[in-house]
Amino acid sequence: MSEFRSALMFGRHNAPAAICVCGNTSFFKHPMASKFWVQDCCAATENILLAAVGLGLGTVWLGVHPIHNFSKRVAKILELPDHVKPLNVIYVGYPAEEKPARTQYNPDRVHWETY
């Protein structure tokens, strides 16, 4: 965890555990399909975040991709092969405090049929 804390710009949180969500580009049969690893990993990340909340855990999503420096550091820490790309690191732990629910929903950002 100390390696992540020093490698990531926003990684200074004091969580006891982390999950690194990675895309394995060697799984794709078609060359164009390998471009969608980011979407696949984002869907997996959201599922991890929701499951953690359901278990009473707190999480924070730390972006890694597309910042080459961050990707390189995380790949080195985890000794990832070249075909495995880190998308993010999720810190997981029990929250120190319970914060009130909030939303970032803004109806002005929702467009129907046309922009």
What do the PLM-derived regions correspond to, one by one?
Residues 1-115:
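Acidic, surface-exposed loops and disordered segments
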